[in-house]
């Protein structure tokens, strides 16, 4: 009897350990983008006109400060890295801590909301 109980506990633990973390919700990220980001940034079709900040179409994988149609602050212009989902998360959590001197005034403190916005941004291609 004890063997069956232990086997059941072990199997349950294995299932829990192998269950992937829930994926970010790009559709929710689009809603958040439209409400929080689209005032300053362009995203996908219908997300807003932006214009005060760089276009975020194709931002994942793009050089930091790499939108040729935007005049970045020096800290972003001088950056050599490319935007990844991790670097975007760090930046959006606290832009001025991540890159002191940035003009980005808004942060996204909620981890799930930030992940959703980044999932949405990752879905956008530069040509959209």
Model segments located where?
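Bacterial N-terminal signal peptides that target proteins for export
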Residues: 1-9
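Bacterial N-terminal signal peptides
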Residues: 8-17
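N-terminal signal peptide c-region/cleavage motif recognized by signal peptidases
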Residues: 18-19, 24
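Periplasmic/extracellular electron-transfer cofactor-ligation site
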Residues: 24-72, 76-82, 90-102, 124-128
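Acidic/polar helix N-cap motif
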Residues: 25, 110-113
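Thiol/disulfide oxidoreductase modules built on the thioredoxin-like
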Residues: 102-110
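Histidine-centered phosphotransfer motif of kinases
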Residues: 120
């Amino acid at each position: 009897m004890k063997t069956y109980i232990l086997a059941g506990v072990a199997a349950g633990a294995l299932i829990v350990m192998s269950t992937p973390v829930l994926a970010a919700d790009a559709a929710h990220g689009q809603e958040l983008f439209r409400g929080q980001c689209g005032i300053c940034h362009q995203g996908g079709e219908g997300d807003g006109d932006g214009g005060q900040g760089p276009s975020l179409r194709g931002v994942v994988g793009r050089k930091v400060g790499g939108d040729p149609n935007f005049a970045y602050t020096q800290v972003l212009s001088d950056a050599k890295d490319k935007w990844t989902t991790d670097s975007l998360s760090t930046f959006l959590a606290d832009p001025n801590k991540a890159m002191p001197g940035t003009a980005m005034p808004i942060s996204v403190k909620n981890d799930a909301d930030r992940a959703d916005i980044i999932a949405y941004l990752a879905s956008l291609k530069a040509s959209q």
